[in-house]
Amino acid sequence: MPKAAASLASLLPQLWHRPVQPPPFLHRALSSSSPLLRRHRAALHSPAAPLSAAAVSTSAATVEAPATAAYPVYGRLLPCPLQDDPPRIEHLVAREDEVAVDFISRSLTLPPLYVADLIKFGAVYYALVAPQPPPHAAPEHVRIFREVTEPSVLCRRKSIKGKTVREAQKTFRVTDPNQRLEAGTYLRVHVHPKRFPRCYEIDWKSRVIAVTDNYVVLDKPAATSVGGATDNIEESCVVFTSRALGLETPLMTTHQIDNCSEGCVVLSKTKEFCSVFHGMIREKQVNKRYLALTTAPVSTGIITHYMRPINRAPRLVSEDHIKGWHVCQMEILDCKKVPWPSSLIRKVHKVDNCGWPQQEAAYECKINLLTGKTHQIRAQLAAIGTPIVGDSAYMTAAMAAIVNPSINPFGRWGQNYDSEDEKAAAVEAWISCHGKEPKSVIGLQASEISWDYEGEHHSYKAGVPWWRQDAVESDLI
């Protein structure tokens, strides 16, 4: 007879960017009248019973829905859907020694082949001990966490002997469906991984710029990920390029560009070169040039901002130095007037207009990237009122600042605030002006990359950017 699982939500702090109170239905689901939870308690307090399973369901922290939310019919992860399913992340603690695929399939009522696909995609993580609940977790969640991490329980775990609790709480990917799970092992299952359908539309061999003994240079298509997502390492540039070239050893990432950007990416063939290239990037020995299609002209010269040191979008930048914020610099080498992309080109490439009216002209900027912060070019150009065409995340904020310059608390016309609470509210209001991350392409290309290595100069250029392509020649029609 299958073992019972008791519901538990919100165990993992890193899944939430901002504190969100658990929806009311979670409290109902975890009430003491739940027969599922009563079985959980009985098993935990029975001297002969093994550690019970704690199943955590976090479909989406902000969704107001009944506890019995309707999920799609699960079969296989392929073929790839064109749209992502709503987020669904499940947290489990093994009740007894188990096989990963069997335990997940039974606990979440998922087909074993679907679970095996999730594991192949890198969407399943484990830790020897369940992580600490976030501060906003419900008391019931905290109670169950304490029960499964009781010192008297942990001291019987052979796998964690010699480890600190913090070490035992470190998560790793499950890589084998038949991986054995010791009783008490924690699992995080991303049931609906982020998908990248564009991967299946690309002629990957045609995107390869160069192949050497140490690396491959790829002209990365937009709407793809260089190395994959937290819950999907399968649909990525490294995997599809490796397959296209027939490589026995998969390529490795050396640096990143945004999913919505296109252009030059260096993928390493060996761990040694990967380490060398990382070192060259740290020492600023790798030169990167970009082309950006902006809504207005940008003056040549160096542009400096300071970026908030918080690792989530949107990336906020300030014209004034703020202690602890990271310096961001780029040099505008050239800016020329070009035709605004035609409606056909924008339709072919699925460019979001973001509510920005079509113009007669756009402006193509050649940029020398002096520092390499995430979203740096996009955030800096938006901050000076010249956002990148199609950038739904930052263009909406730029439009808001054009209408009301004082809305940006870090801009030139930012207000003085009487209290920290007032400033915090202004920052949240400014964040809310930003849109969602683009799902397709924006007017940004990593056009050139170069470096010196072992006495040789290496330099590569990407192809024609999408906004200059003839729609008839596009491979997307």
From Swiss-Prot:
Reaction catalysis annotation: a uridine in RNA = a pseudouridine in RNA
Localization annotation: Plastid, Chloroplast
Active site (catalytic residues): 258
Molecular function as annotated in GO: pseudouridine synthase activity; RNA binding
Superkingdom per UniProt: Eukaryota
Gene3D superfamilies the UniProt entry points to: Pseudouridine synthase (3.30.2350.10)
Residue interval of the organelle targeting sequence: 1-52
Identification of the protein by name: RNA pseudouridine synthase 6, chloroplastic
Biological source species: Oryza sativa subsp. japonica
